[in-house]
Amino acid sequence: MSKDDEGSLVRSLFNLLSGTFFSRLTGMLREIVMATYFGADPLVASFWLAFRTIFFLRKLLGGPILGLAFIPHFEFLRAQNISRAAFFFRSFSKFFCYSAIVFTLVIELGLGVWCSCVTGSLFDTLLLTIILLPSGIFLMMYTVNSTLLHCEKKFLSVGLAPSVVNVLWIGTVFLARNYNPRNRIFGLAIVLVIGFILEWAVTLPGVIKFLGRSTETPKERDSIRALIAPLSLGLLSMGIFQLNLLCDMWLARYINEVGPLYLMYSVRIQQLPVHLFGLGVFTVLLPAISRCVQDNEHQQGYDLLRFSLKLTVAVMLVMTMGLLLLALPGVRVLYEHGVFPTTAVHAIVEVLRGYSGSIIPMALAPLVSALFYARRNYKVPMLVGIAAAVANIVLNVIGCLVFKHVSVLAYATSLASWGQLVILWYCAGKSLPTYKGLMWRTFRESGKTVFTTVLAAFITVGINVFTNTTYIVFIHPLTTPIKPLTSLLDQCGVFFAESALFLAILFGLAKVLKAEDLMNLTSFQYWKGHQSILRN
């Protein structure tokens, strides 16, 4: 294995982001095509509710938690003997494959009985869930294979794999656009199952190549029992977290029959910066930090984490302010086409602005958790995550009953996310004195970045007011547009013009005020991992 430093970290991150960006781009295209041809009605909302339920059931079996438990233990075994590590992966893979199959069969039986007792939109939701549920087996195996490929620094194929599903999704929606609404929704569900099988198949070559390097049977065989305790905590945490997300969807349906659609489309946009960059940094950082801990290179681990925190804060600040400023023109570009109504666009924007406050803590929390996972201490982040999820559910229920607006669910999520980050870092400082104060140091050093970004946003809005173009960023503008923004060309023109204005002001101010973290983001060498740029 090559030595882990800032340069290798960024090169791995670059590879991961390249694949993930393409997958997210195709994912965004599928959202546009869905909105344009399928619109916003209760049947489409039932599809999204079923789709979210599938991921809830899949993550009950582990989901991303598998990587958090597997990677540090795998790196520990590989440092001693690659044959032990390979044997352990085979056992790990078989266990979760068989578990996923049994789990799917049991749930399918239960849903079949329930489906025979209901009618209406609930029947549609359950039937769509029954159709989609087998894809959870292949989603699980894709996740298992991805954990191994991350350790092998094969990030590009893992990031690209979901785009296979998205391309099939887009093609199916386009070809079925003139079919009966009910038939096309159920047909899409069947095609997606095939897509998830292909997504899993993309990861097979890398896994086979690794296993081919270790053909001998190790003298010492390691059981996955070593991961049972941390996985149990992880599954409990993930189960409550996913219950929280599912609760959001059902509460949104309680408030508005199309509420799940508003929530799903806004979450997809909010997750773009978090998953594309925040979790991308974490995915690359965890194996690197784990190796630093195994080799007792604590100073190098400190430097890597500090670098990752500063980089993530700078990017997420820009993303947060950009989301607040560009929510309306961005949602118009994505969704306000074909049969998708303007009222749904405004509802998505309101929810999206509520989620904007969660971008920074959601991106930073996994980086802090890496400190615990690297030492195979899973209890603290899991318990903190459980507490945050429970608090979020309570806030959601209270907000739903008091305000009866879908956007309140997003604001509750943002509030709970900040609470989780604060508690998580407090625990990290108590148990890991070496890293104590690093988070606060990062925020202090990012003060100029915060000031510059906020100032750029205010100047941008000021220019909108001065030029009578507040209709671009406000749902209720101070002035009405000269002509309605109904064509894609007009919507794209407005969005890119507003984006260019904000970014020009932002990076112009960064240069004047010498905000180095922002200036570094415009450096190509910075992203390619050149040491001289990184040290500056």
Curated annotation (Swiss-Prot):
Membrane topology: Multi-pass membrane protein
TM regions (residue ranges): 31-51, 54-74, 95-115, 122-142, 155-175, 185-205, 226-246, 269-289, 311-331, 354-374, 383-403, 408-428, 455-475, 493-513
InterPro entries, per database record: Membrane_Transporter-Flippase (IPR052031), MurJ (IPR004268)
Cellular component terms per the entry's GO annotation: plasma membrane
Residues annotated as signal peptide: none
Keywords, alphabetical: Cell inner membrane, Cell membrane, Cell shape, Cell wall biogenesis/degradation, Membrane, Peptidoglycan synthesis, Transmembrane, Transmembrane helix, Transport
GO biological process assignments: cell wall organization; peptidoglycan biosynthetic process; regulation of cell shape
Name the UniProt record assigns to this protein: Probable lipid II flippase MurJ
Record gene name: murJ
